[in-house]
Amino acid sequence: MKSLFVVLCLTMAYLSVGAQKIYKFQNTKLSDEKRIDALLEELMLEEKIALLGSDLAVPRLGILSCRHHEGLHGLALGGPAAWGGRKKGEDGKIIPTDRPTTIFPQSYGLGATWDVDLVKKVGEQASLEARYYMQRPEDKRTALVMRAPNADLARDPRWGRTEESYGEDAFLTARLTVANIKGLQGDNPRYWRTAALMKHFLANSNEDRRDSTSSNFDMRLFYEYYAYPFYKGITEGESHAFMAAYNGWNGPAMCVHPCLKEITRDKWGNNGIICTDGGALKLLVNAHHAYPTMAEGAAAVVKATTGQFLDVYKPYIEEALEKGLLTEKDIDKAIRGNLYVALRLGLLDGKDSADPYKNIGTIPNEVPPYEREEAKQLAREVTAKSVVLLKNSKNLLPLNASKLKKIAVIGPYADKIVQDWYSGTPAYEITILEGIRNAMKDGQTEVIYATNNAIDEAVNAAREAEVAVVCVGNHPYGTRPDWFFCPVPSDGREAVDRKSLMLPDEDLLKQVYKANPNTILV
């Protein structure tokens, strides 16, 4: 028994020492490159293969899980796409798990502000909330890589994802891209609050057949237009991550394009993450028909220095290794960028990290960032500045509530907050109708509401009122969440381009205007 006790004590002592082991890659006094080299030496092959996915975790070495978040106009942890995950409801049905966040106007609205300081603050708020949910013990939403900003250019309004872009101008988009990156990543010279992963490189300008088409143009258009926001995002914004688009450029699909290494890494200095879009490996083989097998496609992706797959890849990487299509050194080169991002997020430091953001969400009774007054005021300011006055020839605006006895608010979007596919769940919502009613609280002005023109309801409301406000527009994901489907031709969304630029409610607007020339279109 005595010898057994000694053996047990020695075993426990060994386990204790192992648990407290300090690895060379945790030494913050070493250069970034030496730390990454040291980590690569510690990794087993299966761990390296795992790091080709979107999680930066290495549990054996104490490196915590860290995945991706959507965050084009605020952290998305809910919304139509259920970015917050799903859970079982009381009736046993699977329902979305919504976590409230501060949601700002879509990127196109952010572009309309022309305000780099505001767009930076939008990034700051989103990253603060990402850290809060990551580090709050009750949540632990393990993600600090933000899929934002979208540095694509909205050159054609028929593009189904126009609202995800800051606009069609390369210079403006570049300035706002840089601002948003700086907000997301923070101002600390060593650590990032979150990592900004731009998308979608390059020329993701169409949704229909995006999985198999090639955007063809010369090097001048590359440098001066399509790639310019990404170039500035890397060289000035110091983003070290982006997503490769589904489409090709002058032939090769972007996830295997030589320019990833030759230009973005070797010339621009992106030493971080390059990831595929969701399902891009399968599309590379089955839509682009670039490679005969999945193993050959997977090997080509890794050799192009694309270091993260957003779809099933492990069996194909293993097959590529077995067949000699890929080497462990190829994988090392591809995942170095992932490890650099992990380093800048403080994930490689161990428990004694100097990360200045590590306590966000850990303070007892901490007020959630989305409930703070400064967050509400920021959302209000950004929303106000995103509104563009196109025409006011009669000087109808601004309205004077004290001089109005009756105002008509009309249209299908007057009393509705529509979330897009990449939206989260707002902490609070105020519709246009509610906002107008709140502004007329004194009771001197009657507010009439008509959703549409059924039985002349809208026309009669307009005739009764001194002013009519008509709210029309597009639905940002086609009124139904079905993929590849938009029942209204002028609606667009991811995977579906618009077939028309005619608003579905133009007739309603014309009838209201005929009944009351004092009509405001929103």
What annotation goes with each model-predicted range?
Residues 18-522:
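Glycoside hydrolase catalytic-domain context in secreted enzymes
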Residues 1-21:
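Bacterial Sec-dependent N-terminal signal peptides
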